Regions:
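Low-complexity, intrinsically disordered terminal/linker segments enriched in charged
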Residues: 159-222
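N-terminal signal peptide c-region/cleavage motif recognized by signal peptidases
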Residues: 15-18
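Short beta-strand edge/turn micro-motifs at domain boundaries
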Residues: 143-169
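Early exported N-terminus immediately downstream of N-terminal targeting peptides
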Residues: 22-102
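Positively charged n-region of N-terminal signal peptides that target proteins for export
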Residues: 1-5
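Surface-exposed, polar/charged faces of alpha-helical domains
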Residues: 37, 41-48, 52, 81-85, ...
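Surface-exposed, charged secondary-structure patches
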Residues: 100-142, 194-222
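Sec-dependent N-terminal signal peptides
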Residues: 6-10
Length: 222
């Protein structure tokens, strides 16, 4: 599930300049094509440059993903029981988790393509499901549906369903178990610790790559 989620997220990106009149399927296709064009030509992103990957994620996905709705749905009844401080802390860490997952996926792109299925939507509808299929060279295609909700300014994504498994449902099950056993504060702390560890690892990796570059240049000159 996680590998397929990573792949789906790597192909999902929503433009800051999307028009409110743009349909959900048009938005998905246009912006997915845009982000794939960047990834195909950016060797640093393909090599896993976390700084560039996170910058791309922050620019493209954050303003156009309904993190508030996702957070409420993922926590379920625990959202209504949470304090304002807990809600804020959870949203910060969960948002970071999703961006980090997206960033990891972005560096794993290897010439996948997307096929878009025809979409039917009733006039005046405020929710929509955009159905796609990710085609992998030498591999089985993966069915991915993006669920969007119409906001005053534009359509925004609030769930991704991969081969019948919902991102929201998947995380809700994981988080509910931790909350039952140890409480919401424990979940928030675990997410924060995981995010910090990943950030430190990324910083170390980027530093190592930067230090290696001059050495390689010197070696070539010799």
């Amino acid at each position: 599930m996680m590998k397929k989620l990573l792949l789906a997220l790597s192909l999902l990106c929503f433009s800051l300049t999307a028009l409110a009149t743009e349909g959900p399927d048009e938005l998905v296709k246009r912006t997915a094509d845009d982000v794939l064009a960047v990834v195909k030509t950016d060797k640093d992103i393909q090599a896993g440059d976390q700084q560039k990957i996170f910058a791309l994620a922050e620019e493209k996905i954050v303003p156009n993903f309904n993190f508030d709705k996702v957070s409420r749905m993922v926590l379920g009844k625990n959202w209504t029981k949470a304090t304002l401080e807990q809600k804020t802390a959870f949203q910060v860490e969960f948002r970071t988790l999703l961006i980090r997952t997206y960033a990891t996926a972005l560096s794993k792109y290897r010439n996948q393509t997307i096929e878009y299925k025809p979409m039917r939507m009733a006039e005046g509808a405020t929710t929509a499901s955009v159905k796609t299929q990710i085609v992998q060279p030498g591999g089985q295609p993966i069915e991915v549906n993006y669920t969007l909700e119409k906001q005053p300014e534009a359509w925004k994504v609030y769930d991704i369903v991969i081969e019948g498994v919902s991102l929201v449902t998947n995380y809700r099950g994981q988080f509910a178990q931790e909350i039952r056993q140890n409480g919401l504060d424990s979940l928030i702390k675990k997410l924060a610790d995981k995010n910090k560890a990943a950030q430190a690892k990324a910083a170390s990796s980027n530093a190592a790559s930067s230090n290696a570059a001059p050495s390689n240049t010197a070696a070539n000159q010799n």
